[in-house]
Amino acid sequence: IVMRLVGSEMCIRDRDEVDHLRAAYNYDQISGVESPSLEELTSGVGFHYGVVDHGARHLHPLKYCLGLAKAVMTAGASVFEKSRVKDIDIKRDHAVVSTDNAIIKAQKVVLVCNGYLGKLFPPIASSIMPINNFIVATEPLDEATANRINPLNASLSDSLFVINYWKLSEDRRLIFGGGETYSDKFPESITDFVRPKLLAIYPELSNVRLDYGWGGTLAITRNRMPDLGVHKGVVYYAQGFSGHGVPTATMAGKLIATAIDAGCDDFDLMSGLKTLKFPGGPLLRRPSLVAGMLFYSLRDRLGR
């Protein structure tokens, strides 16, 4: 995994972090890369320092999701698709969950809607803010180009507040994530929306076709820590993974399962790390977020 850093402040901070991880935790899989050697990591432009973490991994998220679903069903659980929950009514020692097709009585409810929570469960809604993020995939690149932009076949990201992240697929497509929106609407053309972010790093790909573009909604918290907890002893929830959901949502699921089954000190520890609520309530949360995100986007453009 390679993180490429933009701006002098970020370089200083991450040099210190590399030193801290190596000294305090004896973690020798991470190293810093100064500017003259960055071309060994990628042909991307506009970067001043890099961090390489040889102890990290990247994976295929869809295959991982399908694998988790298979494991759940193998263990005896049932999965019901197209069963959107419309209401959760908490009683003294159970909850009544309503869908379009059924009403279910449950002793415990696990709520992990993240950016898709909407108005389903107001008690926890103000702890998160939904935002949209977008990804494109190029046409298959020739071997020389692929080796030039990502010779280590690593997963890469930069240090901008509105982060860009990318990797190569098995058939040498560049899969590039970049750009955010803060309304409930997606861009008319995701490929047109993301292309400038890609070309800012790899101008050499200006003539490369973008074959696919897609997006989704995630949830952030104010301090970027996941928000875990239990409401009235019945509804366990995990949300606000802030772009790190692939590893941390799995961790949260394990903690919640253990907590429901037999109690879990680690769940109690995580749920004790309270996240601050977004100000403004249901009506003003989003405008305040847009103002803040535009400010930090401007800092990105100014190289701060």
How would you name each of these model-derived features?
Residues 85-87, 92-95, 102-233:
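Active-site substrate-recognition segment that forms the wall
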Residues 30-34, 39, 78-80, 211-213:
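General small-molecule cofactor/ligand-binding pocket signal
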